[in-house]
């Protein structure tokens, strides 16, 4: 089943971007490649039940099970030992990626209190965008009673765009609510 945003990309966004950036080849047109969701576990690294709860939450949000990232070496200043769980990561591609992006843009971001739009300055220089969220409660799949710990996440949207302007144009056409302002 083709996702709504994927269909929008194929029918409208490709032609709009071709006109805007004067592409000569259809393979030059930027597209979404993947969405990577990272979440640090903090104190949950000591508590396996809490770690499982955070992993289950991320599974509900992303539609697939996260990978537990472990410390490669001990850092005494942070109280981290080698092989201790320090984060959760999910990489979304294809239909799951478009479904998550659709829910993020149309359901989750508008539920943020006093939401004015997101900053257009978080591009990395190669057309990829990273967004930090402070809590998971903005997603309709997560209810306040379900969660054990309020915890944010970083969402990286990786595109095939070669410049920030192209990446901004792609995400804007796909419905990302940017604040007024210029890209780096």
Swiss-Prot record:
Binds 5S rRNA, forms part of the central protuberance of the 50S subunit. This is Large ribosomal subunit protein uL5c. Belongs to the universal ribosomal protein uL5 family. Transmembrane segments: none annotated. The keyword RNA-binding applies. It comes from Ostreococcus tauri. GO terms for molecular function: rRNA binding; structural constituent of ribosome. Coiled coil: none annotated. One of its GO terms (cellular component) is chloroplast. Its main location: plastid. It comes from the Eukaryota. It is found in: Plastid, Chloroplast. NCBIfam families: PRK00010.1. Keywords: Chloroplast, Plastid, Ribonucleoprotein, Ribosomal protein, RNA-binding, rRNA-binding.
């Amino acid at each position: 089943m083709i996702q709504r945003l994927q269909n929008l990309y194929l029918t409208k966004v490709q032609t709009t971007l071709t006109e805007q950036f004067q592409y000569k080849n259809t393979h030059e047109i930027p597209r979404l490649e993947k969405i990577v969701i990272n979440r640090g576990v903090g104190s949950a690294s000591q508590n396996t039940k809490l770690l499982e709860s955070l992993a289950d939450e991320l599974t509900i949000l992303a539609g697939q099970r996260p990978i537990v990232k472990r410390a490669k070496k001990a850092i005494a200043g942070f109280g981290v030992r080698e092989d201790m769980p320090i984060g959760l990561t999910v990489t979304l591609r294809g239909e799951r990626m478009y479904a998550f992006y659709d829910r993020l843009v149309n359901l989750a971001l508008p539920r943020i209190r006093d939401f004015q739009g997101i900053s257009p300055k978080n591009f990395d220089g190669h057309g990829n965008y990273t967004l930090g969220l402070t809590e998971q409660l903005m997603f309709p799949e997560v209810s306040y009673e379900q969660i054990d710990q309020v915890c944010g996440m970083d969402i990286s949207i990786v595109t095939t765009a070669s410049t920030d302007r192209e990446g901004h144009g792609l995400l804007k056409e796909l419905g990302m609510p940017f604040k007024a302002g210029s890209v780096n």
